[in-house]
Amino acid sequence: MSTLGDLLAEHTMLPGSAVDHLHAVVGEWQMLSDLSFADYLMWVRRDDGVLVCVAQIRPNTAPTVLLADSVGKLAGPDDLPVVTMAFESGAIGRGSDKAGQGSRTRPGLDVEAVPVRHQGQVVAVLTHQTALAERRLTSPLEGAYLDCANDLLHMLAEGTFPNIGDLAMSRSSPRVGDGFIRLNEGGEVVFASPNAISAYHRMGLNSELDGHNLVAITRPLISDPFEAQELANHIRDSLAGGSSMRMEVDANGAAILLRTLPLVAGGKSLGAAVLIRDVTEVKRRDRALLSKDATIREIHHRVKNNLQTVAALLRLQARRTSNEEAREALIESVRRVTSIALVHDALSMSVDEEVNLDQVVDRILPIMNDVASVDTPIRINRVGNLGVLDADRATALIMVITELVQNAIEHAFDAKTEQGCVTIKAERSARWLDVVVHDDGRGLPVGFSLEKSDRLGLQIVRTLVTAELDGSLGMHDVPSGGTDVVLRVPIGRRSRGAQ
């Protein structure tokens, strides 16, 4: 399915600022849909007059009347005359979709077309559809919602709503159903939804909201006087026609998220809307998660310290032993333990249980050169980015890469080689991480088989690749000289044995 940006690029020549404005409209129109109890479609017009639906939203507060997905559908100018008229006149119009062209589902819809103005030009038209047969007397809540929606739609037609700077704010704001308060131009509450009243009672309010000045009734409830003053300034700024504001406050042990929306028509303030949500339980869960994350990071830190202690003891024992074979085995163990310790070190500083593989590999490579048991100087390079991998598989992959590099250092070069080179080549796609460990040495021995090799390092590699990484591994000579070890690992969390 094409995105809004794709459809705008395909069918229009709108400048970047207009495209950003339409993205901002889409960022806010779930609120419009919920306030209007209506489905919304966004239409743009091609040079030949054909209308293209580029976005669609359905309400959370009412049943949808548009059962089909209309995004990408085309309509002629005569199919939706109310939309064509809105493009040409720049004014809000009303009509009916008797043939069902706009909905692609059923006829008999009441359609209101609202021009979206940006820098004085109509760049799109929003239509919101409601069923003609479902008109009835509205409740006070529905009336307050519809009045606010009407004000916002007129601001949309004037080009004063939304503000592009509010796009990020809209993604984390309270929803209409969480709690809604309507203020008049003097800052007095003219309507408060039941959820908004409950949120204020949670804050410690013992009286009703209706008829009271919201700033005066809210300030005493907030624990921090600086937060209270900041919220008061936000509300006053919105009443004066300023920008939308979002703020979280603590009151009487409750965490409350508020967003203020200025309502302005023709340059005159109509008051403000306040969306409010009780996020006390959400904050409690966030704190619990942060505590668990800190505990996990502390565990990784202690594991790293213990592994470093083990590596130090093995290194000390390697220095004291007189048996060369035992010394080499101990040094290999030091390298393996150090590799795992570096992964836990990275996890101890990560907040999302993911490891930057490039950073860990770059720290391991110098260590491998230091503990190499060959006299030939070896240069180790990394080309490309390994990227980030989840903690479950990062340790196994780091172990595999270090074993393959160590195997190349120890077995790829003969004593006459002046200098060897081992290169780690990484290429990452959406599904796969491909790693090639290349050396410019003498190539594989005659009759060598990866599956039948009795080298401990390669046995470890085979086990990790198949059992832990669900990947594939291959080794072959390179015509220009040397050997390539090719490793492919799925990036997604696939079950073992998945194709």
UniProtKB/Swiss-Prot annotation:
Catalytic reaction list: ATP + protein L-histidine = ADP + protein N-phospho-L-histidine
Single GO term (MF): protein histidine kinase activity
GO cellular component: cytoplasm
Domain of life assignment: Bacteria
GO annotation (BP), single: phosphorelay signal transduction system
Keywords: ATP-binding, Cytoplasm, Kinase, Nucleotide-binding, Phosphoprotein, Stress response, Transferase, Two-component regulatory system
Disruption phenotype: Knockout mutant is severely compromised in growth on amino acid deficient media and exhibits global transcriptional dysregulation of biosynthesis and transmembrane transport, leading to a loss of lipids and increased membrane permeability. Disruption mutant is more sensitive to the wide range of aminoglycosides (kanamycin, apramycin, sisomicin, streptomycin and dihydrostreptomycin), but is more resistant to tetracycline antibiotics (tetracycline and penimepicycline), drugs affecting 30S subunit of ribosomes. Disruption also affects respiration and electron transport.
Region (PAS-like): 178-289
This enzyme's EC code(s): 2.7.13.3
Domain annotation Histidine kinase: ranges: 298-493
Region described as GAF: spans on this chain: 4-149
SUPFAM superfamilies linked to this entry: ATPase domain of HSP90 chaperone/DNA topoisomerase II/histidine kinase
Pfam families in alphabetical order: GAF_PdtaS, HATPase_c, HisKA_2
Processing and modification events after translation: Autophosphorylated.
In-chain residues carrying the UniProt-annotated modification Phosphohistidine: 301
PROSITE patterns: HIS_KIN
Compartments (UniProt record): Cytoplasm
Protein purpose: Member of the two-component regulatory system PdtaR/PdtaS. This two-component system plays an essential role in mycobacterial adaptation to poor nutrient conditions. Nutrient deprivation results in increasing intracellular concentrations of cyclic diguanosine monophosphate (c-di-GMP), which binds to the PdtaS sensor and promotes its autophosphorylation, leading to the activation of the signaling cascade. The phosphate group is then transferred to PdtaR.
This protein's name: Sensor histidine kinase PdtaS
Organism: Mycolicibacterium smegmatis (strain ATCC 700084 / mc(2)155) (Mycobacterium smegmatis)
